[in-house]
Amino acid sequence: MSDQSSDPVMEQLREQISETDLAILEAINRRVTLVQRLHTYKAEQGYDLIDTAREDWIVQYLQRCNRGPITPDEVATISRFLLDLTRRAGGPSRGGE
């Protein structure tokens, strides 16, 4: 077997993967921050914090926008995970978006 750690193509691809992972993390944190702001606004206005119709729309929208290679079912799984994560991180009221 050859030494994979010195393969320049592999190093470049891994670096791109790491950069993409950081961009995903930043996007998730940005989403959580926005949801927290939305929860504050909803609470101030007396709106319901959880909008399941909106959550369903988000999942369907992302499935329609997906150009692969992940499947629509995988998009739904990821979307539902992110919705659950942001609901849990949304603050003391624990509402969703």
Regions found by a protein language model. Give the residues of each.
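Domain-level signature for soluble enzymes in the chorismate/prephenate branch of the shikimate pathway
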Residues: M1-E97
